[in-house]
Amino acid sequence: MADQGLEGSQPVDLQKHPSGIVPTLQNIVSTVNLDCKLDLKTIALQARNAEYNPKRFAAVIMRIRDPKTTALIFASGKMVCTGAKSEQQSKLAARKYARIIQKLGFPAKFKDFKIQNIVGSCDVKFPIRLEGLAYSHGAFSSYEPELFPGLIYRMKQPKIVLLIFVSGKIVLTGAKVRDETYTAFENIYPVLTEFRKNQQ
């Protein structure tokens, strides 16, 4: 798939990714409204890939293998789909869950499908001085190594949260469209190079 942007699979568009690094999408969270009331007990009993424990959580948890995803299905007809690696896969998975519900006899529709969160990650392949970064970008950074090993960077534009690790591994979360993930990474990349650790 040309649009996946997997490292090493095809030349990187340097216009869009001046750093030469394209974050890989790891998880897409989407929601959809099936627009009908659901009997969760019936679904749990009749669908073979479903679990339902109302004492623990008020939704049926359903899984499919392709695309490898998990859905939370609520009695209201609202559904959350997690685990897909691209927007198209997330929508395809959500449609498959909707079809399963239809086959069980519910008049499920497919309304208001929406990507709620995109999680991406990448590796800048050099170590980063997190203390220095946290000090000079104090307004956006929280870094408490005894609580969590990564620096949490809350970017304002686009509104993305980045987890930055000493190793040079970066996690980006909070995007609604993949370009926000890419823009956030390009914004932070010069900062990361500025706080590059010198290898002894």
From Swiss-Prot:
Record keyword DNA-binding present: yes
Molecular function GO labels: DNA binding; RNA polymerase II general transcription initiation factor activity
Cross-referenced SUPFAM superfamilies: TATA-box binding protein-like
Keyword set, alphabetical order: DNA-binding, Nucleus, Repeat, Transcription
Superkingdom assignment: Eukaryota
Subunit structure: Belongs to the TFIID complex together with the TBP-associated factors (TAFs). Binds DNA as monomer.
Protein name, UniProt field: TATA-box-binding protein
Gene source species: Glycine max
